[in-house]
């Protein structure tokens, strides 16, 4: 049994499969009807209008309807699309056992405990016939799939077959009173429209179920006498064919399988039994421990069954439907219907090759599981689960393709798996011993090899190599050298798919796809909520795979997406261009055409084939929010711009890609304050002051505009802005602008007009405007404020602008392919808008709408000032001074024009970038400023995930490898890279590695200080020193292999000290728990410390145990202490005294979790011993050991790495990567 779906609920009494959709109805003893999607495993809906148990339920085969019958005597017809009951049919006088729709007519048949069967017309909502004759509860009634017959089963120990042919001749909807009267009579006494054709007697107790065969004139029944009976009928009679015995309790339900010659029954004995309908013998039995079975349902189209029991229901298959196949170049070999078949992709020709199983062999769940093909020897290995695992070897004659009469005796053997590993060699797995037998084509063993892990399946992994699968990992094993070439932790792998060049492999689990290299180096992992069924590599290195309901793709970086949906599951065999070749569950070859544009586009982006990307943008119909979001997420907003017409999205993408011109055009179309504000922020970031000015004008942000004019030295526009503030009666704005301009008279005037005469007087007096000050003093009279004495006034004037700046100078670079590629298509619209906008920027102040004034009044103010300026220019006559308007300061030169202006040379590659590209050491990446690369390297090499302790070290490395040269105040600081080992004779064209602030000698000095602190008993300080060393080591670089070994040795030394000091500090905290104190002190002695420190540990443990009356344990520590030949006499004397005291009473007062005779390591988190033979996990960096429950947590010893993570190992020298 292959369970596909299972639910937990109240007792399930009725089940019905939907004929087309992956749905199943389950009616419960609690009165609820559940609608489940068994493919997705989700509850779609529930219907709960019945009162009491619902025993019967059935889907209509074409309408969105289902019918239910319950213990409330009601039959309800429901519409599952509208989620409501359409109507209720009343007439039965007792519990309703089953209900069923007719396959053609608008009829429903129902069976009831009132000893009748009723046939209803659900369109006219009336009962059209009552079938009476049973004299006990009618447990079941169903229509024949083709003929006008009904079969019923009753507790009166009979099965009856009814002829309902006369019903078709009557009107389904009675109209007049006479017909209503006859209807009432038929309700009471039974009508003549349905007559009993056969009464089948043979059961000794009540019959619970009877059903027709879908095509043959057979009936099967199950009863309380624990028997299943098979009946045959013809036009005149029906008779018993055979009795199937085996159930130990009442048989609840029994049915014929829709596709195979088998009978399935279930019983209250908690079992489901499968019987061969031809041989009438039992084939398989499936049992549950606590659940009695009550109902069966068979899917009318596909190989699915369902069974309801006391605590829910299960949907299951009896055997696998995945065909076994093997690909070889342009051809496919696959097994179907006891034949090996051959399919050629180019011609799509399908033919039989040879028979592969003798007729008469039991076939249930013993079909071929895997198939392996050797093209050189034209040999096929077929594996199945027969006899616990077996294989058959066939040599295909060259002239047998297309012929199916060539019979040969296969060479057979037992084994869990069998695959070809060379031209004329194949490997067979012996599961019990985890051995591989290498055999030749004569089926003779030529070699035996033990596998490195307990293996339950083997797969081909290249010539002479095997991929071995265990429960939680896979390894690649070289049979010749007996070496493990690669290992990878995975969920349970079901299928293995190699790429065409054997460089990549896809490992398919139930819900996971793992892409790895040929050495099992992980590339990406993909998780699916729906079961993964198959997959194949296309020509571009993209993995195409199927789930139950989708064809999907997986790119090399792990990005995935849906190509198309599926109606039924398929098994991909090959992908060629836009065609997917696959096998369906019937073993038929199919070719499906797909649209590969989306994943080819993403692959081109991933591989940086930008010319290909541009070509696809121009020629393909790529669109959709998902594509835009993908491009944005992957850092290509400038590409996404080409797919977007919505101005708001275009604006966001333009800002993200820094495309100011497109952003201006979109902001002009949108014309909202928030968008202008964001445009101003981005333009300010780019130093484009003209667009910043324009954006501030559009938002009427006078304060920011004033400050912009101040910092760019544009005093003319600042004075115009002051006039506008005066017109708007904005006193604060006017005063600010006067302050920025240094216009004292204007400030005095503003203060006077605002009524602040004392402030105006002080301002005038301080700045030496005596005439104005005297006039104001007269107006103030006796209230003239006095100026402070004894202080020398200083003039507060803003500095005069030396450079009236425009936009920041930018390096001239070539336009990117995505910016210039579509210029011809988009130039017209965008450039026209841009030119219009640029024309307005020079005198953009005209745009303001001032409260209380017309635009023409403001323009008059501003135009007056400009007219005066123009007159002044004209008075110059024919002078050589030419004042150009701002718009013409930097004219646009034509493409071919020669310019005399200085063009900044293109910037070379920064040294930090050279460092980053050349180095694979994390410390040098951090020194180059590539922190993210450094973190990725540390994560891959050492499994480090917690980078907080390394943050300050990263910053130290970066700042220590750079120096900064300051020049003039107006010029930027010049960064200089400091190289390791630089000398005056070094070549200027060769860049050395960065200088590093951490080296191995520093760590050795720190180690000595840590030893000193430990000896002095300053344990907290010592722990801090050792932990600092442990966290610095990943960022140390050494030169030679010998130094690499010393660094690795230092990691172990420091790890032992950190763990030991943590144990001792923890012990000192636990003053209220003497048992735990003794345990921690005992564990401390098992840390590998220097001899002086080990003596201190022994002495401490001896003292603690002696005080707690654990004399035997104390004596052990005293003996260990004396074995180290202590140099301090007091320690030796105390140890001898303890041993003398212990000899008188060699017992322990308390039991400790400590056994010094059994070797162990200490868990670095829970501080408990992990004895030899127990499972543990390790920190990939410091190698500290932990109990398995700590896997996935941050290591508590080094505080850096993830416990149990995969890591390649410490890389601290360039010599390791040469």
UniProtKB/Swiss-Prot annotation:
Residues 831-843 have a biased composition (Acidic residues). It comes from Arabidopsis thaliana (Mouse-ear cress). One of its GO terms (molecular function) is structural molecule activity. Transmembrane segments: none annotated. The coatomer is a cytosolic protein complex that binds to dilysine motifs and reversibly associates with Golgi non-clathrin-coated vesicles, which further mediate biosynthetic protein transport from the ER, via the Golgi up to the trans Golgi network. Coatomer complex is required for budding from Golgi membranes, and is essential for the retrograde Golgi-to-ER transport of dilysine-tagged proteins. One of its GO terms (biological process) is intracellular protein transport. This is Coatomer subunit alpha-2. Residues 826-849 are annotated as: Disordered. Disulfide bonds: none annotated. It is found in: Cytoplasm; Golgi apparatus membrane; Cytoplasmic vesicle, COPI-coated vesicle membrane.
């Amino acid at each position: 049994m292959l369970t596909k779906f299972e639910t937990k609920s109240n007792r399930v009494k009725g089940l019905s499969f939907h004929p087309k959709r992956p749905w199943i109805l389950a009616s419960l003893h609690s009165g609820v009807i559940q609608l489940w999607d068994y493919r997705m495993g989700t509850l779609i809906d529930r219907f709960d209008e019945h009162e009491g148990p619902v025993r019967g339920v059935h889907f209509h085969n074409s309408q969105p309807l289902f019918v239910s019958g319950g213990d409330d005597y009601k039959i309800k017809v429901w519409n599952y699309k509208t989620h409501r009951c359409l109507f209720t049919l009343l007439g039965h006088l007792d519990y309703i056992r089953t209900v069923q729709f007719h396959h053609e007519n608008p009829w429903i048949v129902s069976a009831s405990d009132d000893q009748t069967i009723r046939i209803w017309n659900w369109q006219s909502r009336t009962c059209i016939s009552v079938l009476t004759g049973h004299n006990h509860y009618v447990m079941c009634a169903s229509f024949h799939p083709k003929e006008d017959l009904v079969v019923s089963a009753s507790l009166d120990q009979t099965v009856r077959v009814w002829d309902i042919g006369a019903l078709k001749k009557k009107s389904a909807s009675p109209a007049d009173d006479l017909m209503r009267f006859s209807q009432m009579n038929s309700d009471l006494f039974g009508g003549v429209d349905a007559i009993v054709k056969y009464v089948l007697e043979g059961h000794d107790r009540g019959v619970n179920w009877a059903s027709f065969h879908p095509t043959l004139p057979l009936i099967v029944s199950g009863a309380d006498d624990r028997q299943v009976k098979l009946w045959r009928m013809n036009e005149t009679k029906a008779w018993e064919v055979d009795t199937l015995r085996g159930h130990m309790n009442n048989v609840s339900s029994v049915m014929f399988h829709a596709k195979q010659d088998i009978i399935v029954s279930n019983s209250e004995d908690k079992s489901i039994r499968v019987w061969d309908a031809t041989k009438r013998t039992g084939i398989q039995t499936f049992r549950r421990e606590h659940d009695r079975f009550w109902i069966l349902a068979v899917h009318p189209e596909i190989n699915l069954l369902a069974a309801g029991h006391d605590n829910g229901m299960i949907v299951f298959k009896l055997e696998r439907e995945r065909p076994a196949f093997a690909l070889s170049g342009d051809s496919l070999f696959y097994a179907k219907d006891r034949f090996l078949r051959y399919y050629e992709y180019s011609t799509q020709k399908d033919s039989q090759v040879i028979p592969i199983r003798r007729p008469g062999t039991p076939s249930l769940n013993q079909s071929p599981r895997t198939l392996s093909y050797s093209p050189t020897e034209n040999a096929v290995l077929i594996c199945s689960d027969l006899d616990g695992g077996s294989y058959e070897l066939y040599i295909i004659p060259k002239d047998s393709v297309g012929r199916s009469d060539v019979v040969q005796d296969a060479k057979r053997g037992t084994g869990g798996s069998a695959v070809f590993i060379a031209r004329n060699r194949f490997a067979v797995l012996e599961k019990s011993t985890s051995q591989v037998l290498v055999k030749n084509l004569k089926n003779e063993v030529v070699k035996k090899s033990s596998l490195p892990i307990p293996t339950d399946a083997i797969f081909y992994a290249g010539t002479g190599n095997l991929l071995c699968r265990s429960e939680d990992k896979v390894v690649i094993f070289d049979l010749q050298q007996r070496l493990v070439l690669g290992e990878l932790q995975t969920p349970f792998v079901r299928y293995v798919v190699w790429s065409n060049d054997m460089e990549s492999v896809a490992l398919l689990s139930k819900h996971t796809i793992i892409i790895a290299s040929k050495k099992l180096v992980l590339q990406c992992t993909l998780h699916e909520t729906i079961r993964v069924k198959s997959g194949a590599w296309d020509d571009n290195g993209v993995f195409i795979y199927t789930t139950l309901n989708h064809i999907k793709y997986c790119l090399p970086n792990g990005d995935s997406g849906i190509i198309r949906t599926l109606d039924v599951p398929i098994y991909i065999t090959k992908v060629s261009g836009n065609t997917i070749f696959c096998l369906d569950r019937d073993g038929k070859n199919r070719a499906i055409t797909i649209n590969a544009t989306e994943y080819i586009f993403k692959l081109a982006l991933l591989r940086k084939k930008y010319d290909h990307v541009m070509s696809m943008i121009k020629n393909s119909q790529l669109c959709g929010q998902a594509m835009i979001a993908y491009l944005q997420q992957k850092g290509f907003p400038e590409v996404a711009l080409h797919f977007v017409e919505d101005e708001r999205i275009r604006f966001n993408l333009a800002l993200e890609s820094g495309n100011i011109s497109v952003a201006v055009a979109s902001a002009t179309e949108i014309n909202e304050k928030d968008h202008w504000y964001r445009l101003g922020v981005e333009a300010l970031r780019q130093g484009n002051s003209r667009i910043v000015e324009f954006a501030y004008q559009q938002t009427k942000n006078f304060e920011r505009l004033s400050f912009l004019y101040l910092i760019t030295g544009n005093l003319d526009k600042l004075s115009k802005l002051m006039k506008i503030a005066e017109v708007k009666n904005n006193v604060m704005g006017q005063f600010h602008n006067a302050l920025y301009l240094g216009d004292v008279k204007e400030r005095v005037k503003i203060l006077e007009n605002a009524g602040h005469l004392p402030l105006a007087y002080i301002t005038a007096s301080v700045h030496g405007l005596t005439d104005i000050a005297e006039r104001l003093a007269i107006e103030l009279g006796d209230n003239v404020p006095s100026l402070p004495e004894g202080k020398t006034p200083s003039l507060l004037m803003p500095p005069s602008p030396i450079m009236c700046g425009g936009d920041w100078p930018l390096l001239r670079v070539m336009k990117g392919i995505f910016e210039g590629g579509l210029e011809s298509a988009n130039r017209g619209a965008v450039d026209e808008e841009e030119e219009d906008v640029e024309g307005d920027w020079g005198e953009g102040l005209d745009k303001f709408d001032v409260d209380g004034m017309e635009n023409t009044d403001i323009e008059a103010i501003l135009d007056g000032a400009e007219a005066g300026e123009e007159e002044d220019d004209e008075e110059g006559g024919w002078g050589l001074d030419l004042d150009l308007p701002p718009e013409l300061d930097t004219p646009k030169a034509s493409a071919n024009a020669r310019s005399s202006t200085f063009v900044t040379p293109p910037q070379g590659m920064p040294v930090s970038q050279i460092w980053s590209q050349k180095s694979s050491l994390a410390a040098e990446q951090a020194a180059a400023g590539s922190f993210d690369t450094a973190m990725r390297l540390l994560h891959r090499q050492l499994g480090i995930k917690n980078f907080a302790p390394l943050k300050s070290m990263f910053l130290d490395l970066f700042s220590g490898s750079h120096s900064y040269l300051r020049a003039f105040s107006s010029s930027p600081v010049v960064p200089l890279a400091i190289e390791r080992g630089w000398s005056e004779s070094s070549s200027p064209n060769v860049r050395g590695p960065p200088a590093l602030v951490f080296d191995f000698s520093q760590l050795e000095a720190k180690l000595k200080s840590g030893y000193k602190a430990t000896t002095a008993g300053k344990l907290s300080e010592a722990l801090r020193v050792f932990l600092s060393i442990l966290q610095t080591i990943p960022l140390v670089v050494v030169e030679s292999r010998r130094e690499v070994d010393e660094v690795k040795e230092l990691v172990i030394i420091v790890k032992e000290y950190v763990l030991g000091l943590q144990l001792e500090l923890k012990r000192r905290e636990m003053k209220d728990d003497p048992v735990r104190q003794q345990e921690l002190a005992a564990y401390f002695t098992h840390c590998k410390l220097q001899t002086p420190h080990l003596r201190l540990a022994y002495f401490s443990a001896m003292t603690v145990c002696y005080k707690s009356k654990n004399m035997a344990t104390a004596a052990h520590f005293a003996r260990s202490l004396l074995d180290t030949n202590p140099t301090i006499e007091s320690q030796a004397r105390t140890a001898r005294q303890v041993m003398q005291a212990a000899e008188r009473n060699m017992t322990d007062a308390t039991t400790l979790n400590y056994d010094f005779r059994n070797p162990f390591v200490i868990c670095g988190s829970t501080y408990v011993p992990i004895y030899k033979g127990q499972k543990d996990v390790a920190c990939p960096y410091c190698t500290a050991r932990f109990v398995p429950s700590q896997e996935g947590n941050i290591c508590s010893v080094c505080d850096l790495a993830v416990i149990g993570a995969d890591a390649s190992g410490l890389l601290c020298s360039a010599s390791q990567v040469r």
